[in-house]
């Protein structure tokens, strides 16, 4: 069965989802039938073909009127501003990937379904009333056919949750803190300009900028047992892609740094292969650009203090890794089937 997908929002994640689909060789499993984006077709085709972070797309891309051609594949282009006007029923859409970053609550999901989609996957955490939040590699096996409106969590949640699970299963986490060192995003300013968040009024290329984060809430959504036991802060740095996460946890069992690294390396080679990677090479952020893993543990930065405090550094390509997980979760949602009577 080929899953018929529509993409709502063709920004950073939407375009990377299309690129990842073609580069990963999964076109026999997923076909993109339509993209809804307010920008014009010429701009959509240009930004799919040429990308500052990920380079030129290997596939031929062109557009004619309201059709986007990727190789021999034809994708219908839509410019609908209202979810109710989207022709998902006419197009036989199985799963909508909503990559707008704007929509994300149950009402929005129901609007996609009322328009004819069978299921919806949001590319950000969304509201708490969704049917499920998936971090692929950790909890996708909890998906059921009746889960129609699903969140793929966030790039940072996908990065840190597998590592937290591994450390908790092995040593028992008591509490933790997380610092996200995140590349600049398009909600920041190129030069100083007005923004409701006064820190984000400042030029993104000239400062390390603290921002709010809901990562602690994202952790407890997946692992409710950590409610009030994790805190998170975030800063944006003047790079355009790749994120590092500094994770510190206190654990019940005494441990050595070498044992932590052995655990994480074994997981990367085994149960979490393709989701978690492990390196001890002297790499910097750009070396992880276009890496499809959710998390890459930097073993050179693992530290243990007092036998119970573990500090690790985990990298991720916050665009490419997450786009690949969107595809994984889409297939997992389709694999459990569709119940249209719910």
Swiss-Prot record:
InterPro entries, sorted: E4P_DH_bac (IPR006422), GlycerAld/Erythrose_P_DH (IPR020831), GlycerAld_3-P_DH_AS (IPR020830), GlycerAld_3-P_DH_cat (IPR020829), GlycerAld_3-P_DH_NAD(P)-bd (IPR020828), Glyceraldehyde-3-P_DH_1 (IPR006424), NAD(P)-bd_dom_sf (IPR036291)
Transmembrane segments: none
An example molecular function term from Gene Ontology annotations: NADP binding
Gene Ontology CC: cytoplasm
The keyword Chaperone is assigned to this record: no
Pathway assigned to this chain's UniProt record: Cofactor biosynthesis; pyridoxine 5'-phosphate biosynthesis; pyridoxine 5'-phosphate from D-erythrose 4-phosphate: step 1/5
Sorted UniProt keywords: Cytoplasm, NAD, Oxidoreductase, Pyridoxine biosynthesis
List of catalytic residues: 155 (nucleophile)
Gene3D superfamilies: Dihydrodipicolinate Reductase, domain 2 (3.30.360.10), NAD(P)-binding Rossmann-like Domain (3.40.50.720)
GO BP of this protein: glucose metabolic process; pyridoxal phosphate biosynthetic process; pyridoxine biosynthetic process
Catalytic reactions of this protein: D-erythrose 4-phosphate + NAD(+) + H2O = 4-phospho-D-erythronate + NADH + 2 H(+)
Residues reported to bind NAD(+): 12-13, 318
Compartments where located: Cytoplasm
Annotated site (Activates thiol group during catalysis): 182
Ligand binding (substrate): 154-156, 200, 213-214, 236
Keyword Iron-sulfur: no
SMART domains: Gp_dh_N
Xref: Pfam families: Gp_dh_C (PF02800), Gp_dh_N (PF00044)
EC number of this enzyme: 1.2.1.72
Assembly: Homotetramer.
UniProt function note: Catalyzes the NAD-dependent conversion of D-erythrose 4-phosphate to 4-phosphoerythronate.
Family the entry assigns: Belongs to the glyceraldehyde-3-phosphate dehydrogenase family. Epd subfamily.
Name of this chain's protein: D-erythrose-4-phosphate dehydrogenase
Organism, as annotated: Salmonella arizonae (strain ATCC BAA-731 / CDC346-86 / RSK2980)
Gene this protein is translated from: epd
């Amino acid at each position: 069965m080929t899953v018929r997908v529509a993409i709502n929002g063709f920004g950073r994640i939407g375009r990377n989802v299309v690129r990842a689909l073609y580069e990963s060789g999964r076109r026999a499993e997923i076909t993109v039938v339509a993209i809804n984006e307010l920008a014009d077709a010429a701009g959509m085709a240009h930004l799919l073909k040429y990308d500052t972070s990920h380079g030129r797309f290997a596939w031929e891309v062109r557009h004619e009127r309201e059709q986007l051609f990727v190789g021999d594949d034809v994708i219908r282009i839509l410019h609908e501003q209202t979810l109710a006007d989207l022709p998902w029923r006419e197009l036989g859409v199985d799963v909508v990937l909503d990559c707008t970053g704007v929509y994300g609550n149950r009402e929005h999901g129901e609007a996609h379904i009322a328009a004819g989609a069978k299921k919806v996957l949001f590319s950000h955490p969304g509201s708490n009333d969704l049917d499920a939040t998936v971090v692929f590699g950790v909890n996708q096996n909890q998906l059921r056919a009746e889960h129609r409106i699903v969140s793929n969590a966030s790039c940072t949640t996908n990065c840190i949750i597998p590592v937290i699970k591994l450390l908790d299963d092995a040593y028992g986490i008591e509490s933790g803190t997380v610092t996200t060192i995140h590349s600049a995003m398009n909600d920041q300013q190129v030069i100083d300009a007005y923004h409701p968040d006064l820190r984000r009024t400042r030029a993104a290329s000239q400062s390390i900028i603290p921002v709010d984060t809901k990562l602690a809430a994202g952790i407890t959504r997946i692992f409710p047992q950590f409610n009030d036991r994790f805190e998170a802060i975030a800063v944006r740095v003047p790079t355009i892609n790749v994120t590092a996460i500094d994770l510190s946890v206190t654990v019940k069992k005494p441990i050595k740094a070498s044992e932590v690294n052995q655990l994480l390396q074994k997981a990367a080679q085994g149960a979490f292969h393709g989701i978690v990677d492990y390196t001890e090479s002297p790499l910097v952020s750009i070396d992880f650009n276009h890496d499809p893993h959710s998390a890459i543990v930097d073993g050179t930065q693992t530290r243990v203090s007092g036998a119970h405090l573990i500090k690790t550094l985990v990298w991720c390509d916050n665009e490419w890794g997450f786009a690949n997980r969107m595809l994984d979760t889409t297939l997992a949602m389709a694999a459990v089937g569709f119940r249209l009577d719910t």
